[in-house]
């Protein structure tokens, strides 16, 4: 187990009616608020109206229309609004895309230059200050409500990058599972795949992290149990609550404690999203089983067989390779149960850009020097071809 620092400074208000806690929680941070929302779902389901009512004593400025795979163009608009209106705090009302956009705006206000350069250089210290960010979560998926990451896309350059800074961690997050009752089944499925991927990206590694791995397995089993329930009974409170809480703990640093983590599937999927603007969780559901098959070997066998036994209940008396293969098949079957696509070709994607995507992923991320299984450009291209 490697050394680590673990800190989660987000104050979470979890449960029914917790929106009532927002005014008191936010007031010390400021009263001039930029409210960031998506493309209309929070208007249709009435959540935005409830937020405005709760914050009737605050000065609200709205920025709507954040896309899935949030664009740097929207970040630029938000930065201009904040400077023009003297915004003191940013409130994201939505899912991960909205929260990520809000985080980028919060840091962009203090960045001297184009926000896209800030995104590209976040690991080099480009983020030195940020407005406080609060969230009202409406989708269990990315875990952005409790972490210091934001993923931003540039459609002009076909690029999608993660910006990282502890300054981006939300100060307050309102997490009412009832606010996810209206999430359609396809989005619930994609969000659940995203949660699972966040756990698996750090689970698969060489470190002897017994406790952390058992926590990861419990979180995975939670998603596996409750995602189908939430899809068939969208107003099942316990299902929505468990998915929401699992989403936060999947990526707030707990499951990565003491581990070196590679995020290979995310790096590959970011190329797909950048080129084809597909739903992030859908891309991960297609890529992950094929990545697993590609890297299964003597070195990785023990972890894959443990995954099969402890998460999927595969018979431990079987040969380890058989256990591992069945575990991968069970994951694939679970994604089918959620009615997620399992081939890129079903999304109209062919291999014409694969070599370019693979080269870009290898050049701009740490995938080529990953601590678990390094992937060359050719390996990435081969995995993408396996996904067709």
Language model features by range: what are they?
Residues 77-79, 98-112, 146-147:
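Short Gly/Thr/Asp-enriched flexible loops that form oxyanion-binding sites at enzyme active sites
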Residues 1-89, 344:
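ATP/NTP phosphate-donor binding region
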Residues 196-200, 240-251, 288, 331, ...:
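Short alpha-helical scaffolding segments that buttress acidic/His motifs in well-ordered protein cores
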Residues 10, 20, 111-208, 302, ...:
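A glycine/threonine-rich phosphate-anchoring loop and its flanking beta-alpha core
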Residues 202-330:
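Active-site segments that bind and position negatively charged phosphate/pyrophosphate groups
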Residues 87-103, 138-144, 275-278:
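Glycine/serine-rich anion-binding loops at beta->alpha junctions
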Residues 304, 311-388:
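C-terminal charged capping/lid subdomain of soluble metabolic enzymes
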